[in-house]
Amino acid sequence: MKSLIIFCSILLIANTSKAQFKFLANNSSDQYKAKIFVDKCEGNACSGKATVIVYDKVTDREVDTFHSEDLDFGLTETQNAKLGWLELGKYQTPLIFGDFNFDGLEDLAIRNGNKGAYSSPSYDVYLAAAENKFLPNSELTKLASENLGMFDVDKKTKQIAIHQKDGCCFDKTINYKFDAKNIPYEDSSVIEDSSIADIVTVITQKIVDGKIKRTVQKFKMKDYYNQ
């Protein structure tokens, strides 16, 4: 019986190792580095189920482990995933580190498929918690998964912004702030509608003293996009 258990363990390790490609993400954060194990790499594209292990850069201590159903990212023509432990560039990695909720701690977004609008990238978002652990955040994951890719982070205004699109001529940006309970709420939005002739209609909405203030402006297309 003992021999059977040992054999099964060896077989499991062998199959896991064969099925996964290994990468390093050492340049995405000043505080953290990561090892990435992903199921599939074909040509210049990697995807599928993946495990991400995050380490402290200074101490090499393992901080947390994450899983993604579809860790989708690309490789350059000179990178060969079969070599193992391939180091990914800062803007190539499927991991995004940053202070998303402006509490002074570095948070993490992990690529999980292309579930955004027009098949744009989607991300699972984790906020930093006590003892360097990360907690999943459903509100920010929704914002990073149902719009045009990852939200923008503006440190100066302490806002995050998502982008939406409907066809060729309708674009919307929604800006969010965080309340006392660290929950994002819509603070303002800008709609750009260029569906009528050569006119761009810009509709701005902002919450002022609990009320929505709305302004509508019209511009010549050539003037608006040359500003």
Where are the predicted features?
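Bacterial Sec-dependent N-terminal signal peptides
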Residues: M1-K22
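Repeat-based blade/solenoid architectures
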Residues: D72-T93, K142-D152, F170
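Structural signature of eukaryotic scaffold interfaces centered on beta-propeller domains
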Residues: N26-S28, G89-F102, D152-K155
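Beta-propeller fold detector
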Residues: D64-S68, L135-K142, E186-D193
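Acidic/hydrophobic-patterned starts of short beta strands in beta-sheet-rich repeat architectures
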Residues: D99-N112, K156-A161
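Surface-exposed loop and turn segments in beta-propeller and other repeat-based domains
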Residues: F66-L86, E192-I207
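Acidic, small-residue rich beta-repeat scaffolds with periodic aromatic anchors
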Residues: S17-E62, K155-Q227
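Beta-propeller blade repeat segments, especially FG-GAP/WD-type strand-to-loop junctions
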Residues: Y55-V58, S119-E139, I174-A180
